[in-house]
Amino acid sequence: MSVLQTELPSLSGKTCLITGGAGGLGKAIAIAFLKAGSNVVICDINEERVKQTSAELEGMGSLLAKTVDITKLSEVQQLFDDISSKFVKLDILINNAAIMDRFEPVGDVDPELWDRVLAVNLTAPLLLSKLAVQGMLLQENTNGSIINIASGSAKAGWLAGKHPITMQTLKHGLIGLTKSTAAFYGTKGIRCNALMLGIIGGTNLNDAFQNGVHPEGRQKLGEILSGVRPLPCDVKDIAELCVSLATGPGWNVVNGAVIAVDRGWTSIVG
């Protein structure tokens, strides 16, 4: 009896851009796309991490690593110019980069932090998606895919112990961006979907807790997680899902979807 083995689809000739690609989930996604034969572009604001990841992934495939502040349109435009120069076209965009808030409720929210989180987590995906679709539409046979990385906080307030105002509001916005993009460009050969992640291991989120969080927000997080403890998802599994969703068999009919990636957790607490 033969054992059925699953393989990632071949992405030879495809080019994928991953924001926040120098660490955590972004790095895992980059590795998965390199293994699938794709040209991979990673960008990250952390220059040292970009250099380290670039050196680590050297030899795995065709890689372009850039230090970019994705909140600045001029730097994003330069990134797309660099992609065009090296790989000619972009086929897949994964909006993965994000920063944390401090679990502040609306009465205590810091307007400056709000603006910063908004810029990274929502405005930047808009800018990147804008330039991505403009380039994709110029291709002779447009077959583009945009994947937005969202979370359980996009579903309901405090779901998954997530953020009471800033991140929750912005993740809802990211879902709106996903559906709007999918609705307008689906008939033009560009799909846009979102992954609504639960708890994942192997990320940089623990760094955020070193900067201090709202004490009551931290308490709520503990209460929710102790009520129905989620099973964490491995970044490798999420990365391979991104590859399949981008170009895998059967996924070409999936557009505008918000896919829960949490081992069924939101089916219990959602």
UniProtKB/Swiss-Prot annotation:
Pathway: Secondary metabolite biosynthesis; terpenoid biosynthesis. The keyword NADP applies. The keyword Transmembrane helix does not apply. The active site is at K171. Keywords: NADP, Oxidoreductase. InterPro entries: NAD(P)-bd_dom_sf (IPR036291), SDR_fam (IPR002347). NADP(+) binds at I18, D69, N96, K130, K171, I200, N204. Its EC number is 1.1.1.-. It comes from the Eukaryota. Gene3D superfamilies: NAD(P)-binding Rossmann-like Domain. GO terms for molecular function: oxidoreductase activity, acting on the CH-OH group of donors, NAD or NADP as acceptor; quinone binding. It holds the Pfam family adh_short_C2. It is an enzyme of class 1 (oxidoreductase). Short chain dehydrogenase/reductase; part of the gene cluster that mediates the biosynthesis of diterpenoid pyrones. The first step of the pathway is the synthesis of the alpha-pyrone moiety by the polyketide synthase dpfgA via condensation of one acetyl-CoA starter unit with 3 malonyl-CoA units and 2 methylations. The alpha-pyrone is then combined with geranylgeranyl pyrophosphate (GGPP) formed by the GGPP synthase dpfgD through the action of the prenyltransferase dpfgC to yield a linear alpha-pyrone diterpenoid. Belongs to the short-chain dehydrogenases/reductases (SDR) family. This is Short chain dehydrogenase/reductase dpfgG. The lineage of its organism: Eukaryota, Fungi, Dikarya, Ascomycota, Pezizomycotina.
